[in-house]
Amino acid sequence: MDGTAESREGTQFGPYRLRRLVGRGGMGDVYEAEDTVRERIVALKLMSETLSSDPDFRTRMQREARTAGRLQEPHVVPIHDFGEIDGQLYVDMRLINGVDLAAMLRRQGPLAPPRAVAIVRQIGSALDAAHAAGATHRDVKPENILVSADDFAYLVDFGIASATTDEKLTQLGNTVGTLYYMAPERFSESHATYRADIYALTCVLYECLTGSPPYQGDQLSVMGAHINQAIPRPSTVRPGIPVAFDAVIARGMAKNPEDRYVTCGDLSAAAHAALATADQDRATDILRRSQVAKLPVPSTHPVSPGTRWPQPTPWAGGAPPWGPPSSPLPRSARQPWLWVGVAVAVVVALAGGLGIALAHPWRSSGPRTSAPPPPPPADAVELRVLNDGVFVGSSVAPTTIDIFNEPICPPCGSFIRSYASDIDTAVADKQLAVRYHLLNFLDDQSHSKNYSTRAVAASYCVAGQNDPKLYASFYSALFGSDFQPQENAASDRTDAELAHLAQTVGAEPTAISCIKSGADLGTAQTKATNASETLAGFNASGTPFVWDGSMVVNYQDPSWLARLIG
């Protein structure tokens, strides 16, 4: 690979001190790096000379990043920043502990079916969110799936993978690993749609179940197999795999894209249904445990005052007009950050937050007179978007509850209006943490036939602001007696009214625009479906519903919350 044959450990790259080479691939090298401006440890991907000098790639990467920026899906790994320094493109990402699925399969062999289904479902959630936003991944494979110790799965390399053409991948030698998961239409002149990602995810499911990709051999034979060979049956490869998985794999890997599942969620649901009843419970438990697990906090490292670094060039490229400074530079004042969720990362131990920043190229504009704000305390109340809802609470809260509601359900409104204030107080006091879930099963009872989904989408737009108190306020406001629509009413609420409600509780313009544009409708549909499945796992018959981690809470007892938090 050009430009990165030798490790650059111990050297400086702009404001980044490259500490350790942690990954190397066809598109670039990945380093554990110290960001000396923001005083944190990150994963830094340095793109190869070939890609960095390719104006088409540069343009596509910008475009794909903007598209991926609409994603607010917890299983998509985001980046902190990207740009160009000294003519080399880079991507700055959060560094956490984890292992890619390919390494896990090499070490452990095939996964138990419940675990395989749980991992594929999480990746399917990420892909469905991307597809709803008009983005495709194009390189779904075990190497691009990161699994934490708690089996929380992340899909990486969004933006980079889709910005790179198949021809470029071939030139860089990346196609060998990718071929095992490429849909037949990608080998022809046919236009590949998002269903190529569904095909690839099905191949990943097959490999998780059996320990090997569906087709093996040299490049030409694998390509030919994808196009012409019969779809293999996992039950004949590994004893103990339910025969029902044969049909799941056959549909997901159908040669004709139109014969495949419509969404990755459909694939995941079919895979879950193929499990034996006991294994379905195990898969649900794996998902629940992975979602409850606290996401790791990025590590930091003290930085000496007066650190020296070369300044970056603007994204437009060109020969840098300056050299390294002759004296220490002050910390630069930066322009306001443009908040986006750029879903792109690398095959290393990475995990992401929800709101991420694409900064304008920083410029030195004089010394700063104040120190940077301290990081929040480790026990601070935080917000995390989950596969089926939103977590609000502190890591030290002794009790975590699940609350399920439907936006036009009258008893749900009564429940929230009665207890929201006390719940908020308990969360602020770190006595309680809450996983909020919103469902949409009453859509057809609303005047617009989709109000519940629109309300769920609005809640995720607000969650994207990453403000726990704001989210809880908006969730409660949806059920206000002067706002909540009723079943079979002559009217419900418009997107403009939902946006105004968000504005009244303090949402920023980005969240308001998200609501008005309907950007999160696909995410809402997926997450509401996931929430319904989670609710079904508790054998609940409807909403409102409260679960304390071990049993159903009788919320009709006025003292239920006091009893719960002692």
UniProtKB/Swiss-Prot annotation:
InterPro entries to which the protein is assigned, alphabetical: Kinase-like_dom_sf, Prot_kinase_dom, Protein_kinase_ATP_BS, Thioredoxin-like_fold, Thioredoxin-like_sf
Transmembrane portions of the chain: 338-358
Keywords annotated in UniProt: ATP-binding, Cell membrane, Kinase, Membrane, Nucleotide-binding, Phosphoprotein, Serine/threonine-protein kinase, Transferase, Transmembrane, Transmembrane helix
Topology of the protein relative to the lipid bilayer: Single-pass membrane protein
Catalyzed reaction equations: L-seryl-[protein] + ATP = O-phospho-L-seryl-[protein] + ADP + H(+); L-threonyl-[protein] + ATP = O-phospho-L-threonyl-[protein] + ADP + H(+)
Superkingdom: Bacteria
Modified residues (Phosphoserine): S7
Binding site for ATP: V22, G23, R24, G25, G26, M27, G28, D29, V30, K45
Record topology, Cytoplasmic segments: 1-337
Database matches in Pfam families: Pkinase, Thioredoxin_4
A single Gene Ontology CC term: plasma membrane
Active site: D139 (proton acceptor)
Catalytic activity, EC: 2.7.11.1
UniProt-recorded name of the protein: Serine/threonine-protein kinase PknE
The species this protein was found in: Mycobacterium bovis (strain ATCC BAA-935 / AF2122/97)
